[in-house]
Amino acid sequence: MTIIIQAADPFSEEAKRCIQAYFEELQNLLDEGFNPANTVSADPAELLPPSGLFLVAYHEGDCVGCCGLKVKSDGLGELKRMWVSPSARGLGIARQLLETMEQHAVKMGVEVMQLDTNRKLVAARHLYLRHGYVSIKPYNSNPYAHYWFEKRLVGLSEF
């Protein structure tokens, strides 16, 4: 089983396919549906270095996951668009995406990583809690978010 995590251009066709699949899954899963125009922005341009990063995951040569980082001011970063294809879940890809993104974030000067998530994304919430994220008060007005988390990245070793 070969899993490769690498930086990608968020404007690439593979990145667009991953993000579209993520949006479609949210549309089908969330009680209120999902319209990306109504959520907190994470446009591809915001996920380009030096103020962002976009990672994709490949399993056996197929692009099966992604996540983005928005570098904000004062050492804050926000994890965005974390998604793994249903066909590749259970292989540890989300964990690898998260850990790899945290390592890149440290190199980019991020000291605290924040994220929000929906109550329907139970596995994601458990992933974040297992990896040291703690519940915080809402830091944005995302209408689809029910939980907000953060993790101090200071002290994480760079790769």
Regions found by a protein language model. Give the residues of each.
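Short coil/turn segments at alpha/beta junctions that flank glycine-rich nucleotide-binding fingerprints
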Residues: G75, L91, K107-E111
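Conserved GNAT acetyl-CoA-binding A-motif
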Residues: L98, A105-T117
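Residues forming the Rossmann-fold NAD(P)(H) cofactor-binding site
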Residues: L91, R95, E99
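Conserved active-site alpha-helix within GNAT-family acetyltransferase domains
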Residues: R95, K120-P138, N142-H146
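Active-site acidic-Proline motif in GNAT/NAT acetyltransferases
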Residues: S85-S87, L91, R119
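Acetyl-CoA-dependent GNAT
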Residues: I3-K80, S85, L98-E99, H104, ...
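Terminal substrate-recognition subdomain of acyl/acetyltransferases
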Residues: Y147-F159
